[in-house]
């Protein structure tokens, strides 16, 4: 994967806006598109190309050169129809990698069948992360890999500093 990617983010609510802003801060070229001019204005100077436009229109996306981008992210909020339309347009334009936010299991299944490479269930993922870290202050982050398996990033307690896993009692874990 190239170090600097060209990413288009459609839907600039809390989810899409934060994704666009963070990707730009990480050094990627980011085109951020939303039909709401005010949302676009809030990202001025925080993304490479802030654009007000209707991303459900193929002509708009083609005029913007979206077909030349490496990654397409569909962060559209509650409008499931628009989410599906943009996902199909990204697929039609042969974007190499498409990520879409789903609002339900059925919506997620639909996005996968449409060819989205990664489907995000933001609320479910955050709920799972909170549940795994709430009563364990050493858990900084949690990522579910499968239904019964996950990976945690832990803050190492001082008592384990300079110890091997075996010495700390984790050899069989």
Model-derived regions: residue spans:
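Cytosolic regulatory regions of ion transport systems
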Residues: 1-173
């Amino acid at each position: 994967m190239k170090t600097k990617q060209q990413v288009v983010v459609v839907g600039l609510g809390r989810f899409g806006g934060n994704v666009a802003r963070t990707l730009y801060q990480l050094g990627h070229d980011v085109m951020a598109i939303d039909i709401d001019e005010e949302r676009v204005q809030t990202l001025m100077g925080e993304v490479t190309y802030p654009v007000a436009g209707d991303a459900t229109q193929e002509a708009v996306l083609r005029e913007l050169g979206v077909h030349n981008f490496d990654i397409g992210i569909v962060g559209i909020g509650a409008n499931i129809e628009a989410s599906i339309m943009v996902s199909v347009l990204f697929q039609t334009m042969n974007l190499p990698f498409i990520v879409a936010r789903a609002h339900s299991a059925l919506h997620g299944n639909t996005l996968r069948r449409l060819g989205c490479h990664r489907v995000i269930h933001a609320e479910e993922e955050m709920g799972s992360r909170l549940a795994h870290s709430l009563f364990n202050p050493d858990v900084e982050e949690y990522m579910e890999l499968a239904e019964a398996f996950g990976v945690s990033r832990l803050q190492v307690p001082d008592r384990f500093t300079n110890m091997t896993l075996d010495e700390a009692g984790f050899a069989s874990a």
